[in-house]
């Protein structure tokens, strides 16, 4: 209907001054053009402004998150003695720590009290929990490692020494690469076999470990970070603050130290 009404209106105004008509049309065109520019120009400006605002907000949120993470990290240094990193990429010579005896196992004297309390707490969960191993000298680790290699070759004569070593390294470290030589690591379990403790019991002990400054050193799913498969018996002392932070954020010692080093830059 709207489309058909225009011809009738023009016919009714045949006597109109064409100069006035043309002038009116030009004026209307100018007004429409100005209006369109105003609408779309403002729209583009709003979009650009909003885009800048979103980008700025996103950056601020990222910065805030990074700041929050940095602030959340304990006030410790990656060079602190309790955070000493020993692994295949960070081998160490004999460290000769001052050791103390806890339930027949040697540990760094500085953590003896923590080990006693942690063991007692674990035994409240399951009385069969006991210490299996603590401090080992590099010389002893050499003997242990070589004995494992020989055992693997005896069990499977087709293995070369190199192949046997690779197999052993899934559960034992080469001399100089074992953190047992720090005196800060303990093997503690309800059994003496590998990964055969009750998973629910291990989970409970893992949960209370930070209270005494310990973390499960080689958790499940973190082999790419630690280079070692899951070990339900191997606990490492890192200090209470660090242990709580690492456990809360599911961090290995390698990942935690990387954050601390980034923070200190």
Q: Can you name each region flagged by the protein language model?
A:
Residues 2-265:
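Extracytoplasmic cell-surface/polysaccharide-interacting catalytic and binding patches
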């Amino acid at each position: 209907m709207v489309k058909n009404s225009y011809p009738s209106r023009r016919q009714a105004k045949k006597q109109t001054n064409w100069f006035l008509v043309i002038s009116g049309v030009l004026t209307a065109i100018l007004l429409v053009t100005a209006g369109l520019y105003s609408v779309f120009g403002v729209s583009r400006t709003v979009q650009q402004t909003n885009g800048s605002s979103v980008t700025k907000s996103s950056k601020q949120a990222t910065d805030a998150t990074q700041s929050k993470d940095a602030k959340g990290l304990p006030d410790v240094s990656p060079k602190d003695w309790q955070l000493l990193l020993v692994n295949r990429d960070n081998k160490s010579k004999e460290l000769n720590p001052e050791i103390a005896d806890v339930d027949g196992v040697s540990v760094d004297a500085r953590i003896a009290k923590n080990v006693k309390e942690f063991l007692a707490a674990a035994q409240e969960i399951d009385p069969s929990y006991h210490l299996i191993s603590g401090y080992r000298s590099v010389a002893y680790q050499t003997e242990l490692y070589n004995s494992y290699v020989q055992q693997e070759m005896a069990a499977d004569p087709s293995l070369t020494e190199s192949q046997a070593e690779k197999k052993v390294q899934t559960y034992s470290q080469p001399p100089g690469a074992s953190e047992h030589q720090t005196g800060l690591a303990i093997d503690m379990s309800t059994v003496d076999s590998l990964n055969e403790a009750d998973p629910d019991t291990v989970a409970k002990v893992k949960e209370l470990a930070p209270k005494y400054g310990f973390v499960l050193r080689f958790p499940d799913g973190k082999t790419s970070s630690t280079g070692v498969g899951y070990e339900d018996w191997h606990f490492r002392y890192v200090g209470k603050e660090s242990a709580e932070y690492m456990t809360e954020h599911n961090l290995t010692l390698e990942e935690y130290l990387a954050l601390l080093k980034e923070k200190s830059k």
